[in-house]
Each structure stands twice: as C-alpha cells, then as structure tokens.
Amino acid sequence: MNLVNLENILDNTSFLVLFLTMMIYWVGAAFPSVPYLQALGTAGVAIANLCIAALLGARWIEAGYFPISNLYESLFFLAWGVTAAHLIAQQMSRSHLVGVVTTPVAMGISAFAALTLPADMQTSAPLVPALKSNWLMMHVSVMMLSYATLMVGSALAIAFLFVTKGQNVELHGSSVGTGGYRTGVRLNKPQPVQETAIEGSGNVAVLNTTVVSDAPSLSLQRLSIADTLDNISYRIIGLGFPLLTIGIIAGAVWANEAWGSYWSWDPKETWALITWLVFAAYLHARITKGWQGRKPAILAASGFVVVWVCYLGVNLLGKGLHSYGWFF
C-alpha cells in the first residue's frame, strides 16, 4: 500500500469515526442515564485524533515537508486541533456536553476536506520558495492550534446561549467558575444567594458559583449545564488566545524576513488582528470588568464567525499572500 492510498483511507476513516462519535454524544445527551456512552465517545474522539495524526504523518513522509501548506492539509490539521482541544476540555469538565458541541465541528471540517475539496487540491505539491522556511511550522501550526481552541471555546459559548435562551442568567463567582457537573457542586435556585468561599486543592480558594435570574423558571439541571459550558468556554478561550498572540508575532517576524516588512495589512493579517481584538475584548470583559453570563458569551460566540472568516473566508477569496484561491 502506497502512502497516497493510506492517506485516502485515513481521511475517510477519520470522518466516519467522527460522525459515529457525534451520534454517540447526541444519544448520550438524550439518554444521560446510559453509563458507557461518554467513555465510548471519548474513545471515538481519541481514535479520530490518532487517525488524523497518522494521515498528517504519512503526508509529511510523502511530501517531505510539514503538512500544512495547502487547504486540504490545513483543514485536517485544524480537525486534529479541534479533537485535541476536545480531549483537553473533556478532561477539565468530565462532562459529555463538550462532545455534543465539538464533534459536529470536527466532523464538518473533516467532511469538507475529504468529500468537498477537488482532487487536485488534495494532492501534495512542491513548496513555493517563500514557504521553504522553518517559520512554516512555527507560525502556521501555532495559528491553526489557536483557531482550533478558539473555535471550541466559541462553540461552547454558543451552546451556553442556546441553553439559557430567553433567560436573564448571570453567573457569579470567580471567572474560572466551579462547574456544577464537573465538581458536583449543587447550584442554588435562581435567586440571589450569599457567596461563601471554600478552600480548594493547592491552597487555592474558589467560590461556589450561584446564579441570579429574573426569569421565572430555569431548571437546576439547565443551570448546571450552563455553568459547565460557561466555565469550559472561558478556559479554552484562555488557552487559545496566547497561541493566537504567539502565532501573529511569529508571522510578523517571518514576514519581515521574507518581504522586509513586519505588517502589510494583507487581508489575512487584518482579520487576524480583528480576531485578536474580539477575544482580547472577551477576556478583558471577564477578567477586568467582571462580566458574567450571557453578555460575554455573545462576544465569544461572535468570535466563532470571526475565526472562520479569518481562516477560511479570506483564503478562499484568492486575495493576498495567504490565499488558496479556490472560489475566485
């Protein structure tokens, strides 16, 4: 079996595994009493992650360079990053809710790469001279990982907005939160409650999260779900933002070496800056201004669209130094 055939098998396998895993998580959300579905879903994401890693490794061997130079390769690297971010978030939360949100994103990315892209865009080609640099791995890989983590965090924020739709919910406590499902803390009824500090492990004091709502009814289960989604969304975005910052700085250094200018207001650079500003505003609002609940979630949810425009929209327009030029 040659490497090209192996790549074709692996990309289709990763799509199939992610599709089945998505269905497992959705069934698990509908029937939470079934004990083994969450473990099965986590195993499915891990298998998909390994399949994509093997695909990228085979591509690296075949082409002789780090496989992130065209749209097909970057999409699968992005899918790998989303599955990796899922596993991190799953470890943080111990909740099946993460998979309900993240597996459709990863599955959609792999489906677009494996089933939609033209065959000529799925084949490897020699690198253009400008890409023959160690900065290719250092800059692009970090940017793609930041996109993956920010997408996951933003998708969880969208899920939070869906769960709290029509409710004036505000979560009070630390910015990190406690997570009702994750720690087993039973949230209070939707009315103002006095916060009490409890001592956590590692000499870190945390606050029991309480919820204030003007709405007449929001079940304790939905409050716990909302708390978990808000908590993990914040943590994952907090991981992705430094990666985005490092990636932009690395890109500026590479641009100066290649073209003699740190910043040229290329469409990709402009949208990367917009993305950075959106998530900087989100973190500033939560950490400095103390925003909680739906307001920061709306800001994070808008970041989901901004990241996709930055990554895919600008590229497919065929404009600028970062374009893949498929549609136009």
Curated annotation (Swiss-Prot):
Q: Where in the cell is it found?
A: Cellular thylakoid membrane
Does the record bear Transmembrane helix in its keywords?
Answer: yes
Highest rank taxon of the organism:
Bacteria
According to its UniProt entry, the protein's GO biological process terms are:
cytochrome complex assembly
Q: What is its main location?
A: membrane
InterPro entries in the record: Cyt_c_assembly, Cyt_c_biogenesis_CcsA, Cyt_c_biogenesis_CcsA/CcmC
Query: May I have one GO cellular component term?
Result: plasma membrane-derived thylakoid membrane
Hydrolase is among the record's keywords: no
- Give one GO molecular function term: heme binding
- Keywords in UniProt for this one? Cytochrome c-type biogenesis, Membrane, Thylakoid, Transmembrane, Transmembrane helix
| Short name of any one Pfam family annotated for the protein | Cytochrom_C_asm
Q: What are the transmembrane regions?
A: 15-35, 37-57, 68-88, 97-117, 142-162, 236-256, 271-291, 297-317
PANTHER family of this UniProt entry?
Answer: CYTOCHROME B_B6 PROTEIN-RELATED, HEME EXPORTER PROTEIN C
Query: Function, please?
Result: Required during biogenesis of c-type cytochromes (cytochrome c6 and cytochrome f) at the step of heme attachment.
Q: Which family does it belong to?
A: Belongs to the CcmF/CycK/Ccl1/NrfE/CcsA family.
| Subunit field text | May interact with ccs1.
Question: This protein is called what?
Answer: Cytochrome c biogenesis protein CcsA
Native species of this protein?
Gloeothece citriformis (strain PCC 7424)
Question: What is the phylogenetic placement of the source species in the record?
Answer: Bacteria, Bacillati, Cyanobacteriota, Cyanophyceae, Oscillatoriophycideae
